[in-house]
Each structure stands twice: as structure tokens, then as C-alpha cells.
UniProtKB/Swiss-Prot annotation:
Cellular localization per UniProt: Cytoplasmic vesicle, Secretory vesicle; Cytoplasmic vesicle, Secretory vesicle, Neuronal dense core vesicle; Secreted
Glycosylation sites: T181, T183, T251, S424
Protein name per the record: Chromogranin-A
Region (O-glycosylated at one site only in cerebrospinal fluid): 41-59, 181-191
Organism this protein belongs to: Homo sapiens
Basic and acidic residues bias: start-end ranges: 116-144, 263-272, 291-303, 330-360, 414-431
Keyword Signal: yes
Principal place of residence: cytoplasm
Pfam families, sorted: Granin
Chain positions with Arginine amide modification: R456
GO BP: adenylate cyclase-activating adrenergic receptor signaling pathway; defense response to bacterium; defense response to fungus; defense response to Gram-negative bacterium; defense response to Gram-positive bacterium; innate immune response; killing of cells of another organism; mast cell activation
Primary gene name: CHGA
Misc note: Binds calcium with a low-affinity.
Ranges of compositional bias, category Acidic residues: 171-180, 229-249
A GO CC term attached to the entry: chromaffin granule
Length: 457
């Protein structure tokens, strides 16, 4: 009996354990599973979609497990995006490094090629310099030989040069001489070390042309007077430039290359013109002489002129760097103009300050004088005031005393008012002058600031 009872109890217990217990947690899970099934069926049935109910949406949104799963998926997507970005950036940096290396290699190759080209160019340039030196020596020798052989055939070229000098206009000769002197640089520049054969040939041709022109000009007395006047004007201009003070010409020191060659040319021209004046002053004597005597005189004159002018080409016309000289001259002229402007500005400022000081002193003196006069008058009135009172005390009933006491005060009051009006009228133009001076000073300061900015720029 007992065994049967135990078996019955065991069977009952097994049945009880096999039956499901409907707990609230199980109900929620079942609802979530149903909603998931609906969503899956909706996604699978795309041609004919089956819509998900609103209750399923709410249950899925409220379930934390589904939210965590979705967040996890989003994190995975973000990590994938970051990984892709990192890979792209690495590839870009590698490309940059490779491009930079390529550029460096190209630059190094270019530098090496340029160095090779420079070496290849310097070798023939040194050869050219040596050849130019040899050519210049040969040209000097040939020039000396031609100078020695030239006096034999002088009379005919002299006549031709005279005819050409008479035919040429004075204005054209002036222009040609100025061009000849301006186009050739001075000999004192350090950069022009080696004279070329072309420069020496040009110098010889120029000396011959100057000699011929001066001889042609010797036949024109009016032209000689013009030349003398021009020389006097040039000397006056040079003297004025030398007399400029150091304050106005600070940039004169900046010129390290004085044009000595030009001065030598001017000396040669003055001597040749003096010779030409002597020749023109004695036309009758030359006509009276024989043609042989004329030829000898002209021969001696030409020798002297050639000896004087031979000194000039050796120092002048070295190199062909007229462009650099022109640039230096332009720069120096600009600096000279700037210095003149600054000196003028300084002078104007000094004058304005001196005028202001004088005006201030005059105003102070006027104020002192007026204050002294007023104090003196006040004292005078103070001392004279008791007079009528005493008189009134002595004779109070007299009418004449009262009139005498009242008149001076009234009469003396009028000139004071007149003087004050005159002082105010005089002060008005003074105030206007001060205002105009202050405006001029402000404009000068603005101009000075602009010049400083331009210099710094």
C-alpha cells in the first residue's frame, strides 16, 4: 500500500512540473516574439507587404533588449566608418609623402643640371675674356700705328671736316655731343675692369669726331659766343651745386663714382674751343699766310688735340653697362629729390615753430602790458577816488564839486572800452593766422608721415 501511494504521489508531481506556469515575464517574452515574427514576415513579404501593428511597434520600442541590440548595431556601423576614414587618411598621407619625395628628387636633379650648365658656361666665358684682352691689346697697337701714320694725310680730311662742320646745324652738334658724353659711363666704376675692343674703337672714333667738329665750329664766330655762354652757365650751375649745404644734400655722399672722364672731356673741349677762338679771331692773318703755313698750323693743332683726347678714351668707355649706370643715376637722383623735400619740410617746420614762438611772445608781452596798464589805472582811480569824497566832506552842497567828481570817471571809462574793442579786433586776425598755421602744420605732418611710409615701403 505504501509503495502504491508513493508512486501515485510521484506521478502527480511529474504532471505538475510538466504543466507551464503562466507568469507575467513569460507573457512579455511571448508578445515580443510575436512582434518579431510580424516584422520578419513584413520584411520577407516585400512584393506584398504585411503591415506591422501599432501594438507591436510599442512593445518593441519599450523592450530594452531590442534597444541594446540596435545600439550595438549602430556602434558597429560607426566603428566601420571610422576604420574606413583611417584607411583613406593613411593612403592620402602616403601619396603626399611620395609626392614630396618626387619633388625633392626633381629639385636636386635640377640643381645638379644647373651646376653643370654653369660650369660649362664659365669655361668658355674665361676663354672669351682672354680673347677680348688679346683683341684689346691688338687694337691698342693698331690704334697707335694709325695715330703715327695719320699726320701724313691731314690736309684733305681737314678740308672735308671743315665743310661738314659748316654744313651741320649748331643744335644738331649740341645734341650729338651730349649723346656722346651721356652714353659712355665713367671710368671709376669697379665693376668695369676689362675694356673691350669695341669700346676702344668707339673712343677713337669719338675723339676724331670731336676734333673735326671743333675745327668746323672754329669758322663760325657766332657759334663760339654761344658756346662760351653755355660754358659759363654750366660753371655757374656746378658752383651752385657745390654751394648746397650738407642739410639739403645728404645723399651727395652716397655717390662713390664721380664722373672723372666727363670732366676730362669738358677740359679737352674747352681747350679746343679756346684754340678755335684764337683761330677765328685772326681770319685775316690766316688768309694772308700761304697754304703751306696753314697746313702746318692745322697739323700742329691736331697733334695737340689728339694728345689731349688720347688720355680720355683710356679711362672712358670700359664695358657696355650703360643700363646699370643709368639705373644708379636714377636711384641717386631720386634720393637727392627726397632729401631736398625733407630739407624743405624741415625748413618749413622750423619757420612755423619760430613764427609760433614769436607770436606767443608778442601775445605774452601784450597781455603783460595790458595788465600793467589796468593795474596802474586801478591804482590811479583808487588814489583819485577819495579826492571828491574829501571835497564833498568839505563842501557837500556845492554842485560844481559833484560834477568834477563824476566827469573824470565817465571820461576815463570811454578810452578803456575803445582800447578793449581795438584789442579784440587785433586778436581776431591773429587767431585766424594761428588757425591757418596749425592747419599748415597738420598738412606738413601728414606729408612727412606719407614720405616715411614710402621710404619704409
Amino acid at each position: 500500500m505504501r509503495s502504491a501511494a508513493v508512486l501515485a504521489l510521484l506521478l502527480c508531481a511529474g504532471q505538475v512540473t510538466a504543466l507551464p506556469v503562466n507568469s507575467p515575464m513569460n507573457k512579455g517574452d511571448t508578445e515580443v516574439m510575436k512582434c518579431i515574427v510580424e516584422v520578419i514576415s513584413d520584411t520577407l513579404s516585400k512584393p506584398s507587404p504585411m503591415p506591422v501593428s501599432q501594438e507591436c511597434f510599442e512593445t518593441l520600442r519599450g523592450d530594452e533588449r531590442i534597444l541594446s541590440i540596435l545600439r550595438h548595431q549602430n556602434l558597429l556601423k560607426e566603428l566601420q566608418d571610422l576604420a574606413l576614414q583611417g584607411a583613406k587618411e593613411r593612403a592620402h598621407q602616403q601619396k603626399k609623402h611620395s609626392g614630396f619625395e618626387d619633388e625633392l628628387s626633381e629639385v636636386l636633379e635640377n640643381q645638379s643640371s644647373q651646376a653643370e650648365l654653369k660650369e660649362a658656361v664659365e669655361e668658355p666665358s674665361s676663354k672669351d675674356v682672354m680673347e677680348k684682352r688679346e683683341d684689346s691689346k691688338e687694337a691698342e697697337k693698331s690704334g697707335e700705328a694709325t695715330d703715327g701714320a695719320r699726320p701724313q694725310a691731314l690736309p684733305e680730311p681737314m678740308q672735308e671736316s671743315k665743310a661738314e662742320g659748316n654744313n651741320q646745324a649748331p643744335g644738331e652738334e649740341e645734341e650729338e655731343e651730349e649723346e656722346a658724353t651721356n652714353t659712355h659711363p665713367p671710368a671709376s666704376l669697379p665693376s668695369q675692369k676689362y675694356p673691350g675692343p669695341q669700346a676702344e674703337g668707339d673712343s677713337e672714333g669719338l675723339s676724331q669726331g670731336l676734333v673735326d667738329r671743333e675745327k668746323g665750329l672754329s669758322a663760325e664766330p657766332g657759334w663760339q659766343a654761344k658756346r662760351e655762354e653755355e660754358e659759363e652757365e654750366e660753371e655757374e650751375a656746378e658752383a651752385g651745386e657745390e654751394a648746397v649745404p650738407e642739410e639739403e644734400g645728404p645723399t651727395v655722399v652716397l655717390n662713390p663714382h664721380p664722373s672723372l672722364g666727363y670732366k676730362e672731356i669738358r677740359k679737352g673741349e674747352s681747350r679746343s674751343e679756346a684754340l678755335a677762338v684764337d683761330g677765328a679771331g685772326k681770319p685775316g692773318a690766316e688768309e694772308a699766310q700761304d697754304p703751306e703755313g696753314k697746313g702746318e698750323q692745322e697739323h700742329s693743332q691736331q697733334k695737340e688735340e689728339e694728345e689731349e683726347m688720347a688720355v680720355v678714351p683710356q679711362g672712358l668707355f670700359r664695358g657696355g653697362k650703360s643700363g646699370e649706370l643709368e639705373q644708379e643715376e636714377e636711384r641717386l637722383s631720386k634720393e637727392w629729390e627726397d632729401s631736398k623735400r625733407w630739407s624743405k619740410m624741415d625748413q618749413l617746420a622750423k619757420e612755423l615753430t619760430a613764427e609760433k614762438r614769436l607770436e606767443g611772445q608778442e601775445e605774452e608781452e601784450d597781455n603783460r602790458d595790458s595788465s600793467m596798464k589796468l593795474s596802474f589805472r586801478a591804482r590811479a582811480y583808487g588814489f583819485r577816488g577819495p579826492g571828491p569824497q574829501l571835497r564833498r566832506g568839505w563842501r557837500p552842497s556845492s554842485r560844481e564839486d559833484s560834477l568834477e567828481a563824476g566827469l573824470p570817471l565817465q571820461v576815463r571809462g570811454y578810452p578803456e572800452e575803445k582800447k578793449e574793442e581795438e584789442g579784440s579786433a587785433n586778436r581776431r586776425p591773429e587767431d585766424q593766422e594761428l588757425e591757418s598755421l596749425s592747419a599748415i602744420e597738420a598738412e606738413l605732418e601728414k606729408v612727412a608721415h606719407q614720405l616715411q611710409a614710402l621710404r619704409r615701403g
